[in-house]
């Protein structure tokens, strides 16, 4: 009994999937691949531009915070530590 119910549910899921795939394929053939590709490239372009702007804003914020910390340390007479990876000539 349980296996029959499971098979009925599985058949329904397979049928739903087949209907979805066939609808997608029909739409893709009707529209052609060029508009889909163009839209995909445009969306990727927007994503890359947004990522670059976010990286620039994050770097600007990091530098601003570093300047504030360095100035605060200077006011209390503490030397700011050297940046990581900096070499000291002795």
UniProtKB/Swiss-Prot annotation:
Cellular component per GO, a single term: plasma membrane
InterPro entries per record: DUF1490
Domain of life: Bacteria
Pfam family, any one: DUF1490
UniProt-recorded name of the protein: Uncharacterized protein Rv1993c
